[in-house]
Amino acid sequence: MNINIQDLKKKIIYRATYRGTKEMDSLLVSFTKKYVDILNDEDIICLSNLIDIDDENLYKYKQSLKTTVKINENKVTKLFRDFVYKKI
């Protein structure tokens, strides 16, 4: 499968912006804007997979709580879990 990484980055930013909960919108937009241009292609795919996870499980994962879905640990999930969101 041939993936256009630039198009995928645009989709990731869009999907991070329109989540469903304002809190997750803010958190994911801040996180993706910080990292989307410095991650390598493999990590961008991992970020896309992370964005596919529903808000509730993603929030639980961020808080180190038990989730109802399997989230594969990788560089991006570690960055997300360690990310400190600063509300402006």
Q: Residue spans of the language-model regions?
A:
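Positively charged, polar, low-complexity stretches
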Residues: 2-88
